[in-house]
Amino acid sequence: MINKKLKSKSVLITAGAQGIGAAITKHFIDSGANVIIHYFSSEKAANELKNYAIEKGQKAIALKADLTKESQVNLLIEKAIEAFGGINILINNVGSLIARNSLDKMEENFWKKVMDVNLTSMMLVTRAATPFLVQNKNSSIVNLASLAGRKGGHAGSLAYATSKGAVLTFTRALSTELGEKGVRVNAVAPGLILGTAFHNTHTTKASAQKTIDGIPIQRAGNANDVARAVVYLASEYDGFITGATLDINGGVYNM
């Protein structure tokens, strides 16, 4: 999907070099945007996407950071502003199940780690980027939530589902707070998205097939399904949509 209204806009995508994040980054590049590609461990993929954008005549940088560390977040934003002069769009894509743990096996450190990766990092990046987002007209934020945040997730995803439910609330609350400053805030909640490290690591083939059998359109999603929705919400042509969550799950959850 090519969105000409994104041409020359500056977009920061966290975890923008693998899985859903890589698809999001590529869709923004193909729409003419300049991209700030954050990564933690996917340096090679990040640089490949950076070079892809540069070859198309656009600006791009790849920056490494641990987004659970405030100092590294602040440095990331500082480098982005130095390179691009501003940020128009923020995509908060960082997130992980980390491991499956039920309540009776839940350790405090594990719980805190999941919350730090999925929620605290989002707050830190958004807080650091917002002073620059508000300087540009029609800026927007898109947060990556999950169907697990809607329904509670599969067995062992208590901490993950809780954190993603909090992302939904964070999105609604922040849309109210930043609306008067001209920044829209929305989220997407993907369901089963195969071909990603998340499901390759944490979902068995049998579990995936069982889930697919319950999806009305009878297929799993893919990273491009999510990327198209993110680009839509981030763009200027839907300027009256804020505080919303777009469910991408083939009809499993349709409220």
Short names for language-model regions:
Residues 131, 176-177, 239:
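Alpha-helical segment proximal to the catalytic Tyr-Lys
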Residues 2, 97, 231, 242-255:
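Short C-terminal tail/terminal secondary-structure segment
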Residues 126, 163, 171:
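Active-site helix of classical SDR
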